[in-house]
């Protein structure tokens, strides 16, 4: 087995995060030859990242949103104009889920995407009917 440093693979995300180092997940390949599966969906990036880095504890998962939000903004040095605060652009997503864990675990559908206070995407929740055999 490969020990650290890996010749190709992921770094020690859990350890870096635990030490307070800014860790962010991202995707720069969208439907290209390097990664044809890339679609720009950061929830997919996070879902795969949590599996690949073995971040599986409930608290870790509940805090993982930072890897694709706050920490990414810090990495790109746009943290002063990022976040849900008075005076900042209203950029956010609303998922059909009770909490962050369920949004990731259930691959919850995106209900709203808001950019600069304008609704860009609105999805009507799916209606599901389950019929059990008698």
Name what the model sees in each region.
Residues 4-5, 39-42, 110-112:
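Short low-complexity, flexible loop/linker segments enriched in glycine and/or proline
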Residues 1-11:
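Active-site core of metal-dependent hydrolases
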Residues 1, 35-36, 106, 132:
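Short Asp/Glu-rich motifs
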Residues 86-134:
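C-terminal cap of metal-dependent C-N hydrolases
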Residues 9-95:
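His/Asp/Glu-enriched, well-ordered alpha-helical/loop segment
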């Amino acid at each position: 087995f490969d020990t650290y440093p890996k010749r190709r693979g992921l770094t020690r995300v859990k350890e870096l995060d635990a030490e307070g180092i800014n860790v962010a997940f991202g995707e720069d390949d969208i439907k290209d030859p390097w990664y044809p599966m890339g679609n720009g969906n950061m929830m997919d990036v996070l879902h795969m990242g949590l599996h690949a880095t073995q971040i599986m504890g409930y608290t870790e998962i509940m805090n993982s949103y930072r890897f694709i939000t706050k920490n990414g903004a810090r990495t790109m040095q746009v943290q002063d104009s990022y976040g849900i605060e008075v005076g900042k652009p209203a950029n956010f997503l609303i998922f059909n889920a009770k909490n962050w864990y369920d949004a990731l675990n259930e691959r919850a559908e995106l209900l709203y995407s808001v950019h600069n206070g304008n609704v860009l995407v609105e999805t009507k929740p799916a209606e599901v009917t389950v019929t059990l055999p008698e």
